[in-house]
Amino acid sequence: MSKFSITIWDVLKFEILNAQEEFLSEISLEVLQAITRRLSEGVTEVSQDLPLAKYLQPITKECNEQLQEPQHKQAKPSQSILSCVSAASPVSFTLVVRTVVPPIFTLYQEADGIVKQRALLDTLNVLFESATTVFGQWTTRGGEITIDNPLLEFRDQFSEIFGQVLMGAAKEEVSFRVTALKGFLRLSTLRAFFQDNEIGLFVQYLDEILLKEESVGRDDLKKEAIAALAEISKHKPRLIMDITFPAFVATLPEEAEGSEALYLPTLETLAQISVERDIFETLFRRLFSKLSILLQKEQPGSVAYPRAILVTLLYVMQQRNMEQDQSIDLYFDKIVVGLCRNVAASASGTAKNRILNDPTVLDTLGRLCNLLVRSVSTEKQAQVAENVYSLFTTSDEFVPVPFTQNPSADQQRTTIISTYLLAGLSKDCGNKLPHTNPDMSALLLDLIHRSVTSTEPAIHQAYLRQLALLVNKFLSKQDLAIAEKLFDSLLESQDTETKNLSPATIRTIFWLAKALVLRIAPTTTHVLTSLLALISSPDQQTSVTAAQSFAIILGEDDILSVTNGATIRLLCRQRLFTTVIPLISSRIREVNIAGTDDSAVITKVPDHIKPAHLTALSGILSTIPTALVMPELPTLLPLLLQSLDLQTAGSVAVRTATLDTLAVIIRDNGVVVIDQCGHVQSLVTRLLKTTSLNAGPGAVNSPRLRADALKCLNLLAVHQSPPGTTSNTRAPPGISPLLPVKNQVLRSLHAVLDDPKRDVRKAAVDARGAWLRGVDDAPEDDE
């Protein structure tokens, strides 16, 4: 190998330095590294007489020559060469460093501009990366190497140069400083290179950048500084706890006065660098102490600050595996037990302030409690189940909400917390819940009564979620009839003459239906047909509210989720789709026929019925996988087109959902599926009408709608073939189904280029370009 190694280098050099094909360059680099490894085998001492040294000599010489102008094109390939041969073994790394680093220092001192200096630092960073590969990081175990790291003799010079650039360069030279930061970070994590005090100096630099410097441009330097602190925390957590935490926590205010900018950046940084266990424990102690002080103040200021503290703790806990955390019981006692008691005190009016009466704070605290309850032992969960309404207090301290006559709004807001606690419990805890013996019929009835009468949105939503959670997760199969009877009783509460229901009652009906449909209860078909009947109500408010509520049934929810152990059957989406869609389609067809029949025999259908059914359709389709939709596309596409015909302000949400559905269909299946249904012209015409700022009298096309319609037009031109086929495969061969409407589209889009909204103009440019490039004119006949 040593005999021919230099000859091989001469051959491979051209492929790397003058790369025509990227894969050839990559293979050539792999060959160079393989030869370096082979020649390094059995070598324990560095010598210039080694075959390895003779092999590396022309390589390093060539690279040094190319690096004379490090900002030029061929310097990058030279860096790649140095990277692959230096990372092959400790001996090769030593030979490369001794040959390459001193000239780089000389070039750096003589450099006449920042561009050249930055390129030289990039080269050093490449060598630092190789050093990490060869010698490992602080966290690398085993693999002790007998050869000393050759970079050690340059340690002081590295520290001086990189520190000077990081903290001494002009603030506007962001990329230069980022390069220095990355190099400093690599050296700080390189095993046994810097002493702790030297890494600590780097940590101080990073803290100063984050705490004292103003943001520049896209904040790239600050983002890199945060990432660097997070990386150092894995290797040297004590430095972060001793240096960064005191500096950052000292900037947090004692109370929320003034702008959120005073504390949000600090909390965001602390959250991102505190995932490691030891550091998180420190973060928890510091922030929980801040929160406790705020809760004891009579005038703590805005609730945004304590909420931000809770959000920070929640974010970090979500990044960690809390089930394996050794301190989980401590967090449980402090947050779930301790803060829930504080919530009860606030609801009873005995707290010093109203922080824990705020629904947004309670929601964040609830999410935190939910995460912890899911992570604790069965015994702890049983404790939560027993205290889910009392919030770990006695009856003298706090009166739980269920069955309480006329509770205050503050008391009712505790339902937000109790709902999150319930969601975190396993199903096995169902028999330990209060008010469930012999069954939960009375509890469910109480919740329904509160749901239909509550007026505060946060409280109303908490009642709805808790009702659905109890029915879906904790109600046994044998007791399902309880929920089904309650569902029917709610429907029967309609006014016999006007057939109207209050919006709160309708939402209660749909959340109860959601609980039953997700678990595919025996009466699922009856439930769904009953919901559809509400859309046909002669009362417009009842019809419209019911139609908008169809998105609730399969919509994502943080409480009723798989994570929380809710019963969500795999076939629930298919069951809903196959039951409801044919009925909606049939009903719209009936309305269309009635609208065109002038016979006096046919009773006129109220104007709101058809838009309401289309609204329900869009709500359902927004939660249904495309694979279920495609077999029914010939039936659904005309309905989607009719949805785009709606032109009132109230239809914007429906049309937005319709455009989202169409975008997915086109992207996943190509324009051919639209063509097979025979609706290319109809679809394009409606999309163009939706892109118009002045589509006609009474028309409302919001900027979002206009941009979404343009996105669909763009997708039509880009995805003319189904996935898996070549771009030239079309039906009929060679002619695009979009060709007949190409001129119409280009003319219309030309007008949209003057839209007052920038996002719309950009979407129009993209769509017009796609049609010009992608929709070919018909081929001329050969003579």
Residue ranges and their predicted role:
Residues 725-730, 734:
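Intrinsically disordered, low-complexity regulatory regions of eukaryotic transcription factors
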Residues 782-783:
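A beta-strand edge to alpha-helix "cap/lid" segment located at domain peripheries
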Residues 594-596:
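Fungal intrinsically disordered, low-complexity polar regions
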Residues 1-551, 555-559, 563-584, 605-616, ...:
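Structural marker for long, regular alpha helices in very large eukaryotic proteins
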